[in-house]
Amino acid sequence: MTFPRALTVIDDNGMVISIIFWFLLIIILILLSIALLNIIKLCMVCCNLGRTVIIVPVQHAYDAYKNFMRIKAYNPDGALLV
């Protein structure tokens, strides 16, 4: 069975359609790559936001607690004998 000659614009044995499909495939791969890069950027932004909002303030609070609870070491020269 052959394709009707009236509908054939260029007899290139499917080369034009093949090229169109390859271009579509390349465009889809590029779009997926861009989407993947944007997802990775979003993950990095979320990690930085979590560090800024949660980890750094908790670390400052813990440092303040450590400084507040620090007890000076016993110094025998400074002790008062009663």
Swiss-Prot record:
Stretches in topological domain Intravirion: 41-82
Keyword field: Apoptosis, Host Golgi apparatus, Host membrane, Membrane, Transmembrane, Transmembrane helix
Main location, first listed in the record: host cell
UniProt-listed Pfam families: CoV_E
Intervals, Virion surface compartment: 1-19
Subcellular location: Host Golgi apparatus membrane
Record-level GO BP terms: disruption of cellular anatomical structure in another organism; viral budding from Golgi membrane
Quaternary organization: Homopentamer. Interacts with membrane protein M in the budding compartment of the host cell, which is located between endoplasmic reticulum and the Golgi complex. Interacts with Nucleoprotein.
Protein name as it appears in the record: Envelope small membrane protein
Lineage: Viruses, Riboviria, Orthornavirae, Pisuviricota, Pisoniviricetes
